[in-house]
Curated annotation (Swiss-Prot):
UniProt keyword annotations, A-Z: Allergen, Glycoprotein, Seed storage protein, Signal, Storage protein
Additional information: The variability of the residues taking part of IgE-binding epitopes might be responsible of the difference in cross-reactivity among legumes.
Stated role: Seed storage protein. Accumulates during seed development and is hydrolyzed after germination to provide a carbon and nitrogen source for the developing seedling.
InterPro entries assigned: Cupin_1, RmlC-like_jellyroll, RmlC_Cupin_sf, Seed_Storage-Functional
Organism: Lupinus angustifolius (Narrow-leaved blue lupine)
Span of domain Cupin type-1: 174-332, 391-548
Sugar-bearing residue positions: 239, 498
Keyword rRNA-binding: no
Protein name in the entry: Conglutin beta 4
Biased composition (Low complexity): 137-146
Length: 590
């Protein structure tokens, strides 16, 4: 009994101790869960704020765990934890450790996943605030890119519309505006310009790579200094009058040239051109055929100026002294020029400007003009061109003529000067409101310059000649024409020219020997009209009678009224309007 009494208090004491331990364990475990539950939202919020944050070092996590253990020991009412509790805590930490490692392994891959999702459709999953912001930024950037594409498309459309309004000049390889000329020399007395190469913009004009167009203009009482060139020239005066002097080793010849006069100037021939008029400017156009290098030619001047050097300056001192049997200083002073001596001469002559300061186009006095024109010959106004002298493009009757225009032509077989060059010259006059009927040249390529007036032309070609024959597409090349413009008519390409004002055209025909001009409409020289009647019915969709009636409907040849049907329609509408006005007045009276 006594033993039972002793054991009972002991049992109660043990139960009390166990109860206290359980209570302490429960309190500690509850506090730990509260701390852990309080820390996890912060960790998730930190991960959402910066998902690419690098994992914390392992020793830092160990320090934090040890610090938490010490805090938990301080909170316990008992003397400390039992070994079983510590072991359970370590087991819980070990269970949490693999989860952290998995999270750490997933964090470096998050950036790659976002990069992949930029190029792939996003998955249907909940998004954080940061992801939503990124998606909004991505959508805004894509919208900006899309708006940029739209702006670029709008600019391209505007450029395309601008090119259309500009007569498709940029897409027309056969048209060259006057702005395509490049200035070689320019001063206050005039200028010399050259057109860009024909084959520079398209390989369709490859056969014209050895032909260039040169134009020079000079004011009254001026002289273009002597020079020679490594190119053959065919020269035509378009405005004013000129006196040209051609110098050969054994003689010198001078010719007076008027508007429409032409002259062959062989390569290597020294020449100089004078504008003798007191009031009118001189304008000359030349077709250049280079000798040494296709498409390139050079002018060689014996004198030096601010625009070019004398070809004598290219020789050595010893060569010049031996050539002229004179000291070099004297040669330099007389031929090449000395800057110091030029300044002294200017001071002695009252600062008067020297010819070397003016350039290649200089002013001359009236006395010098009279002396230069003393022995000049005039051009031939009648008959065939001579072998050496100038000739006029309108010296003979036009080959095509009616009340709407005139067509002059000098073929190689009628022009001894251009026969070896295989060049023909044409001069076309189209009256205002008239049309040069559609036609094509059998083998000649024509380079046409607008001398005066305005109009437009339509040239028919093939869009892509590299395709097969059954895939070729007809294309119309058109442009507005004004003074100074140039266009090319390839062989076999039909063309028509419409004059909105009195139009004057100068043409150089290349490969012109035995060329034949074939008109596609009109009462004469019409190749369509020469087709057999049965062939006409088989060629066109209309009946044979309709085709015959349509072809014969045009009574004019070569030139015609540009808008006959429109004018008749306007006249009929005007008469109909007047009758309607009178009938309305009568109806009000009665």
């Amino acid at each position: 009994m006594i033993k039972m009494r002793v054991r009972f208090p002991t049992l109660v004491l043990l139960l009390g101790i166990v109860f206290l331990m359980a209570v302490s364990i429960g309190i500690a475990y509850g506090e730990k869960n509260v701390i852990k539950n309080h820390e996890r939202p912060q960790e998730r919020e930190q991960e959402e704020r910066d998902p690419r944050q690098q994992p914390r070092p392992h020793h830092q996590e160990e320090q934090e765990r040890e610090h938490r253990r010490e805090e938990e020991r301080d909170r316990e009412p008992s003397r400390g934890r039992s070994e079983s509790e510590e072991s359970r805590e370590e087991e819980r930490e070990q269970r949490r450790e693999p989860r952290r490692e998995r999270e750490q392994e997933q964090q470096p891959q998050h950036g790659r996943r976002e990069e992949e999702e930029e190029w792939q459709p996003r998955r249907q999953r909940p998004q954080s605030r940061r992801e939503e912001r990124e998606q909004e930024q991505g959508s805004s950037s894509s919208s900006r890119r899309q708006s940029g594409y739209e702006r670029r498309e709008e600019r391209e459309q505007e450029q395309e519309q601008g090119s259309r309004s500009d007569s498709r000049r940029q897409r027309n390889p056969y048209y060259f505006s006057s702005e395509r000329f490049q200035t070689l020399y320019r001063n206050r007395n005039g200028q010399i310009r050259v057109l860009e190469r024909f084959d520079q913009r398209t390989d369709r004009l490859e056969n014209l790579q050895n032909y260039r167009i040169v134009e020079f203009q000079s004011k009254p009482n001026t002289l273009i200094l002597p020079k020679h060139s490594d190119a053959d020239y065919i020269l035509v005066v378009l405005n004013g009058s000129a006196t040209i002097t051609i110098v050969n080793p054994d003689k010198r010849q001078s010719y007076n040239l008027e508007n429409g006069d032409a002259l062959r100037l062989p390569a290597g021939t020294t020449s100089y051109i004078l504008n003798p008029d007191d009031n009118q400017n001189l304008r000359v156009v030349k077709l250049a055929i280079p000798i040494n290098n296709p498409g390139n030619f050079y002018d060689f001047y014996p004198s030096s100026s601010k625009d070019q050097q004398s070809y004598f300056s290219g020789f050595s001192r010893n060569t010049l002294e031996a050539t002229f049997n004179t000291r070099y200083e004297e040669i330099q002073r007389i031929l090449l020029g000395n800057e110091d001596e030029q300044e002294d001469d200017e001071q002695r002559h009252g600062q008067e400007q020297s010819h070397q300061d003016e350039g290649v186009i200089v002013r001359v006095s009236k006395e010098q003009v009279q002396e230069l024109r003393k022995y000049a010959q005039s051009s031939s106004r009648k008959g065939k061109p001579s072998k050496s002298g100038p000739f006029n493009l309108r010296s003979n009757k036009p080959i095509y003529s009616n009340k709407f225009g005139n067509f002059y032509e000098i073929t190689p077989n009628r022009n001894p000067q251009a026969q070896d060059l295989d060049i023909s010259l044409t001069f076309i006059e189209i009256n205002e409101g008239a049309l040069l009927l559609p036609h094509y040249n059998s083998k000649a390529i024509f380079v046409v310059l607008v001398d005066e007036g305005e109009g437009n032309y339509e040239l028919v070609g093939i869009r892509d000649q590299q395709r097969q024959q059954d895939e070729q597409e007809v294309r119309r090349y058109s442009a507005r024409l004004s003074e100074g413009d140039i266009f090319v008519i390839p062989a076999g390409h039909p063309i028509s020219i419409n004059a909105s004002s009195n139009l004057r055209l100068l043409g150089f025909g290349i490969n012109a020997d035995e060329n034949q001009r074939n008109f596609l409409a009109g009462s004469e020289d019409n190749v369509i009209r020469q087709l057999d009647t049965e062939v006409k019915g088989l060629t066109f969709p209309g009946s044979t009678e309709d085709v015959e009636r349509l072809i014969k409907n045009q009574q004019q040849s070569y030139f015609a009224n540009a808008q006959p049907q429109q004018q008749q329609q306007r006249e009929r509408e005007g008469r109909r309007g007047r009758r309607g006005h009178i009938s309305s007045i009568l109806s009000t009276l009665y």
